[in-house]
A protein has these predicted regions:
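Short, aromatic-enriched amphipathic alpha-helices that serve as compact interaction elements
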Residues: 67-83
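C-terminal-biased regions
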Residues: 4, 8, 15, 21-33, ...
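Solenoid-repeat scaffolds in large eukaryotic assemblies
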Residues: 84-88
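Intrinsically disordered, low-complexity, repeat-rich polar/charged segments
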Residues: 40-46
Length: 231
């Protein structure tokens, strides 16, 4: 997590604007800190970077806004990594709750939303919820909250993700990327892993978007979006 905090400071020094993409491999001399933007309404080819003009949800001052947003993202990742639902619930917007999206396309009518106390209760209730449908087969995703978290939230060590995007979709599959329209008053941080095994030829990439809205001057979690290659 210290590495991410260092990147926050680097972003401030470089004066990165909204639409920031942090390439963590830059610390090893393998890339550069770059500012790119774009949230397409139609998905590009599988796993390809998303290019285009920056689209931000509001007029939050870029340098301070990005630093605070990245810090909020770190807090959520800490809670997810330690499987601490109580800590996660404390970061959720008390009125809007947090909406879970199993694939990139946000479905405001069907995606499940939990208020903080509901989130804590669901963690221990053993109740299976209908989260949506699997890519390809179209089977119903019926899982308990802990099971869903393992498969569709913290399915990779996102606290060590090699690339981080602020209001920027780094890569996408066949699914529609509609985070900007689904959350017009919010900002998001995307944590991205490229293909992790050579045999998969890049098709095993994955990403986690954490969507935040301002509440009383602080960022509160309102959405968690899982992305991966889809059929």
């Amino acid at each position: 997590m210290k590495k991410t905090a260092l990147l926050c400071l680097l972003a401030l020094l470089i004066g990165a604007a909204a639409g920031l993409t942090l390439n963590l491999s830059a610390l090893k001399g393998e890339g550069l800190l770059k500012s790119e933007g774009g949230i397409p309404l139609e998905a590009p080819p599988q796993g390809s970077p998303v290019e285009g003009p920056a689209q931000t949800a509001n007029d939050t001052e870029p340098q301070q806004g990005n630093a605070a947003l990245l810090m909020a993202g770190e807090q959520v990742l800490d809670a997810l990594q330690s499987d601490n639902v109580e800590a996660l619930a404390a970061l959720v917007d008390t009125e809007r709750g947090v909406t879970f999206t199993p694939y990139s396309t946000v479905d405001s009518q069907n995606d499940l939303t939990f208020l903080p106390d509901q989130l804590v209760g669901a963690a221990t209730s053993g109740t299976q919820y209908a989260w949506g449908y699997t890519s390809g087969k179209g089977d119903a995703i019926r899982l308990t909250l802990p099971e869903y978290m393992k498969s569709y939230v913290y399915n990779a060590e996102y606290s060590s993700a090699p690339m981080i995007g602020v209001d920027h979709v780094i890569a996408s599959g066949n699914s529609l990327e509609n985070v900007a329209t689904a959350y017009p008053d919010a900002h998001f941080v995307e944590y991205y892993f490229p293909g992790r095994t050579p045999a998969a030829a890049g098709l095993d990439w994955c990403a986690l978007k954490l969507v935040f809205a301002q509440d009383g001057g602080s960022w509160k979690l309102v959405g968690i979006i899982h992305s991966e290659w889809t059929i």
